[in-house]
C-alpha cells in the first residue's frame, strides 16, 4: 500500500543523500522514480538533487505554480512511476502537499518527501507543517550540534558569522549561511 513519508531534520543531516539512496534502491530493482526539487534552490545545478558527498541525480523542478498531482499523473501515463521523491519539501505549498496525498491515495504511488522542519527563527515552514500533519509516516533524520547534542534547529548567519534574527523566511544558502544547532544553543543565539 502506497504511503506519504516525510523525512525531516535540520540542515546537514543527509536528507538529499538519503533521497538519492532511496531512488537508487528503486532503480536497482528496475523500477522508475520521479525526483522533484525546488526551483528556488540554486545551490547546485538547476534540475539536480545533489548531496554534499558528491552524488547527484536529475530532477524535475517544482515551484508554487505546478500542480504536482497533474504533473505526476501525466508522467505516470507515459511511463509507469513506482515512487515519487521530493527534495526541499519545506518549499511546497499546503495545496501541493494535498496533491501529494492524492498521488498516494488515487494513483497508489508512494511519495517520499524530504525537508527542513523549521526555519532560522524556529518557525515551521508551511510545506513542513502540512507534511507533519498529513504524512502517513514521519521519520526524523538526525544531525549534531557543535556541542555533540542532537541539532533540532538551524540558524542563519550574516557575513560575519553572527546569528540573524529577522528577514525573509526563504533565503537559499548552504553551510556558509546556515548552521544546525541544539535547542539550547539556538535559544542562546536567536531567542536571546
From Swiss-Prot:
For this protein, the record's Gene3D superfamilies field holds: 3.30.60.20, P-loop containing nucleotide triphosphate hydrolases (3.40.50.300)
Residues in coiled coil: none
The chemistry this enzyme catalyses reads: thymidine + ATP = dTMP + ADP + H(+)
The UniProt annotation places ATP binding at 9-16, 87-90
**Per its UniProt entry, what is the enzyme's top EC class, as one word?**
transferase
Q: How does it assemble?
A: Homotetramer.
HAMAP family cross-referenced by the UniProt entry: Thymidine_kinase
Q: What PANTHER family does the database record attribute to this sequence? A: THYMIDINE KINASE, THYMIDINE KINASE, CYTOSOLIC
Q: Which family does it belong to?
A: Belongs to the thymidine kinase family.
In Swiss-Prot or TrEMBL terms, this protein is called Thymidine kinase
Species annotation: Colwellia psychrerythraea (strain 34H / ATCC BAA-681)
Amino acid at each position: 500500500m502506497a504511503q506519504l513519508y516525510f523525512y525531516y531534520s535540520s540542515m546537514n543531516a543527509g536528507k538529499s543523500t538519503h533521497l538519492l539512496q532511496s531512488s537508487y534502491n528503486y532503480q536497482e530493482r528496475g523500477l522508475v522514480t520521479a525526483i522533484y526539487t525546488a526551483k528556488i534552490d540554486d545551490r547546485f545545478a538547476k534540475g539536480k538533487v545533489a548531496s554534499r558527498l558528491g552524488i547527484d541525480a536529475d530532477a524535475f523542478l517544482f515551484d508554487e505554480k505546478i500542480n504536482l498531482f497533474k504533473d505526476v499523473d501525466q508522467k505516470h501515463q507515459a511511463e509507469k512511476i513506482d515512487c515519487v521523491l521530493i527534495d526541499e519539501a519545506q518549499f511546497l505549498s499546503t495545496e501541493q502537499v494535498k496533491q501529494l496525498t492524492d498521488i498516494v491515495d488515487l494513483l497508489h504511488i508512494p511519495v517520499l518527501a524530504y525537508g527542513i522542519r523549521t526555519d532560522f527563527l524556529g518557525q515551521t515552514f508551511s510545506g513542513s507543517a502540512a507534511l507533519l500533519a498529513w504524512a502517513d509516516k514521519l521519520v526524523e533524520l538526525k544531525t549534531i550540534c557543535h556541542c555533540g547534542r542532537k541539532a533540532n534547529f538551524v540558524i542563519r548567519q550574516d557575513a560575519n558569522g553572527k546569528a540573524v534574527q529577522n528577514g525573509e523566511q526563504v533565503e537559499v544558502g548552504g553551510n556558509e549561511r546556515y548552521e544546525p544547532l541544539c535547542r539550547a544553543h539556538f535559544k542562546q543565539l536567536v531567542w536571546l
